[in-house]
Amino acid sequence: MATKNPTKIEMRDLLQAGAHFGHQTRFWNPKMGPYIFGARNKIHIINLEHTVKAFNEALTYVNGLAAKKNKVLFVGTKRAASGVIAEQAARAGMPYVDHRWLGGMLTNWKTLRQSINRLKELEKQAEDGTFAKLTKREALERTRDMEKLERSLGGIKDMGGLPDAIFVVDVDHEAIAIKEAKNLGIPVIGIVDTNSNPDNVDYIIPANDDAIRAVTLYVTSMADAIIAGKEYAQTQAGGKAEQEAPATEEAADAQTEEAATPAE
């Protein structure tokens, strides 16, 4: 399911954002050869015809996921991506990781959920006046614990279970996240620069992954496509805003346990 007019990205938008500038030629990954137009001043130039086609396919894909009330996890922990990842994922009502990827965020979801429950418990205590009844030292310790957990898990605390896809800015930087997703059979959408390895990425979007203007364009476009998908679903339902069905955590646990079980 998708909107009749899903979000589209145009060649001129990518050019203006500098999405065609790759890395220095000496740092290239040969697997990205098919997506490279040429080189200028020892900098690889990405063929944006490939980028436009791949990006719009990815936008149509996430648009359809959102229309079916599925979840797309936004991942971008480096400086150029973290701010816009948190902002746009929140705008689209999607989970995100913007601080640091903790090993096992997907493959060890059952255990990680305990930390999420602890975060929610501390947030409740902060709101209901429990902290005010503690000694200053105890209140400070709990506040610090809450802030630490919020930095690491705040973006996924309401995810409810494993995502249906992940969108990654800089696939090399987020290699652990991609590996976990692939182990669980979760589709990966990735911005892949000329120095990166496109292996294990289901939707390869060849583009610059460092320029803040370009990264902002990518992430905002993804969020727009998701919002459009949600709005289309509501229109199809007669304009009634249906509550999203929470993912069954039992199903998520079963999925992670199945992936962790070695084949006989």
From Swiss-Prot:
Gene3D superfamilies documented for this protein: Glucose-6-phosphate isomerase like protein, domain 1, Helix hairpin bin
Q: Which GO terms describe its cellular component?
A: cytosolic small ribosomal subunit
Q: Give this protein's Gene Ontology molecular function annotations.
A: structural constituent of ribosome
Determine if Transport is one of this entry's keywords: no
Q: Tell me which InterPro entries the record gives.
A: Ribosomal_uS2, Ribosomal_uS2_bac/mit/plastid, Ribosomal_uS2_CS, Ribosomal_uS2_flav_dom_sf
Which SUPFAM superfamilies did the record assign? Ribosomal protein S2
Q: Which CDD domains match?
A: RPS2 (cd01425)
Going by the UniProt record, its keywords in alphabetical order are:
Ribonucleoprotein, Ribosomal protein
One Pfam family recorded for the sequence: Ribosomal_S2
Q: Origin, by domain of life?
A: Bacteria
- Keyword Manganese set for record: no
A biological process (GO) annotation for this entry?
A: translation
The segments labelled Disordered in the record are 233-264
Q: Please give the family membership noted in the entry.
A: Belongs to the universal ribosomal protein uS2 family.
Query: Which protein is depicted?
Result: Small ribosomal subunit protein uS2
Starting at the broadest rank, the lineage of the source organism is: Bacteria, Pseudomonadati, Pseudomonadota, Gammaproteobacteria, Moraxellales
The protein's gene is named rpsB
